[in-house]
């Protein structure tokens, strides 16, 4: 149960007060850095009055606020955030000074933090899906000696289930850095992306790979404008075609000069039918080569379909000279494949060409 003082602080923090009350808020312990603390009663995010709406990239969940308070050795705020609902175990993950560790234990944290609980917290932070959460995860787990007892296989499995992209790295630190970077790119958390890239300039290739894999053409466009694209358009197309429905990334690669026929062939190899027909809708035409590849990978129905070349044509509703990411996303927002629909209708009308496995 919250004490009367803690409850009063929570009520005050959940309401906006004019700057006339700044001195009172400082004395009341509701001041952090250069401004008063605000707690959103709905989403439980902590943010300053300078951001008068939730879900900005500067918001902090209670756990992230706790870790920041631990790092700054602010005992008053540590107690306050735990009273408001922050999990004191998050303060222990940072392996802070003895007096801070003792305080987190007094407030309910268990030490030592077990391996299973450590991995649960890693998952919880990854599932926050916020810029602050990604930065929190990087801060808590990279260079963290508590992870030395976790097997590489276990760590790989946990990170793959959260990031949905294969990760490689010689060390746990490199692996975790790429993991949090990938999450930032997946959700286009620009503040986190710039933070990671500033610290890991050698990870440009990984940044490109993730942006293509996660269909994030906002980041691709930024790199393109800065002339930091370091690989060929066709290699970019290879990464874009790894994941189904990566229409924006495929489109952007084509605008940079990647071959649509190459994209179509890659999509056949990857068994990504929707990407395949998107390439045809954009203008892929080398169906002889595509038919041979389809037969090689045992996609006989598709191979038979490519014999009917006159069935396919470019979808003229797809504008081919867009370069602004938002315009591309807007155009593709209502996209459905014209050629896929025609292929389905052809199979229905000609069941004799259908090969049943």
Curated annotation (Swiss-Prot):
<dbReference type="GO" id="GO:0039548">
    <property type="term" value="P:symbiont-mediated suppression of host cytoplasmic pattern recognition receptor signaling pathway via inhibition of IRF3 activity"/>
</dbReference>
<comment type="similarity">
    <text>Belongs to the asfivirus MGF 360 family.</text>
</comment>
<dbReference type="GO" id="GO:0030430">
    <property type="term" value="C:host cell cytoplasm"/>
</dbReference>
<dbReference type="Pfam" id="PF01671">
    <property type="entry name" value="ASFV_360"/>
</dbReference>
<keyword id="KW-1092">Inhibition of host IRF3 by virus</keyword>
<keyword id="KW-0945">Host-virus interaction</keyword>
<comment type="subunit">
    <text>Interacts with host IRF3 and TRIM21; these interactions mediates degradation of IRF3 through TRIM21 and ubiquitin-meditated proteolysis.</text>
</comment>
<keyword id="KW-1090">Inhibition of host innate immune response by virus</keyword>
<keyword id="KW-1035">Host cytoplasm</keyword>
<keyword id="KW-1113">Inhibition of host RLR pathway by virus</keyword>
<dbReference type="GO" id="GO:0042330">
    <property type="term" value="P:taxis"/>
</dbReference>
<protein>
    <recommendedName>
        <fullName>Protein MGF 360-14L</fullName>
    </recommendedName>
</protein>
<dbReference type="InterPro" id="IPR002595">
    <property type="entry name" value="ASFV_MGF360"/>
</dbReference>
<comment type="function">
    <text>Plays a role in virus cell tropism, and may be required for efficient virus replication in macrophages. Also inhibits the host cGAS/STING-mediated type I interferon production by inducing host IRF3 degradation through the proteasome pathway.</text>
</comment>
<keyword id="KW-0899">Viral immunoevasion</keyword>
């Amino acid at each position: 149960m919250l004490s009367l003082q803690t409850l009063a602080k929570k009520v005050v923090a959940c309401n906006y007060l004019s700057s006339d009350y700044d001195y009172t808020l400082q004395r009341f312990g509701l001041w952090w850095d250069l401004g008063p603390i605000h707690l959103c009663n709905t989403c439980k995010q902590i943010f300053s009055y300078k951001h008068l709406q939730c879900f900005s990239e500067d918001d902090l969940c209670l756990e992230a606020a706790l870790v920041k308070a631990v790092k700054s050795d602010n005992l008053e705020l540590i107690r306050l955030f735990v009273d408001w609902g922050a999990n004191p175990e998050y303060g222990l993950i940072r392996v802070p000074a003895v007096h801070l560790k003792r305080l987190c234990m007094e407030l309910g944290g268990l030490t030592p933090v077990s391996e299973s609980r450590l991995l649960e917290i890693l998952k919880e932070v990854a599932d926050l899906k916020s810029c602050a959460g990604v930065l929190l995860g990087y801060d808590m787990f990279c260079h963290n000696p508590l992870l030395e007892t976790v097997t590489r296989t276990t760590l790989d499995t946990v990170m793959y289930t959260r990031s949905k992209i294969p990760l490689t790295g010689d060390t746990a630190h490199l692996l975790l850095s790429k993991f949090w970077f990938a999450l930032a790119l997946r959700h286009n958390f620009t503040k986190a992306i710039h933070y990671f890239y500033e610290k890991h300039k050698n990870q440009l290739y990984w940044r490109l790979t993730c942006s293509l894999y996660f269909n994030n053409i906002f980041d691709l466009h930024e790199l393109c404008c800065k002339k930091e694209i370091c690989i060929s358009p066709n290699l970019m197309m290879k990464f874009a075609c790894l994941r189904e429905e990566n229409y924006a990334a495929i489109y952007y690669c084509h605008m940079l000069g990647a071959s649509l026929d190459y994209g179509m062939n890659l999509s056949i190899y990857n068994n990504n039918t929707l990407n395949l027909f998107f390439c045809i809708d954009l203008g892929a035409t080398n169906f002889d080569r595509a038919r041979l590849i389809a037969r090689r990978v045992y996609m006989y129905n598709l191979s038979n379909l490519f014999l009917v070349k006159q069935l396919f044509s470019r979808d003229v509703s797809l504008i081919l000279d867009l370069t602004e990411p938002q315009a591309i996303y807007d155009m593709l927002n209502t996209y459905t494949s014209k050629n896929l629909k025609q292929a389905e209708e052809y199979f229905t009308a000609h069941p004799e060409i259908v090969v049943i496995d």
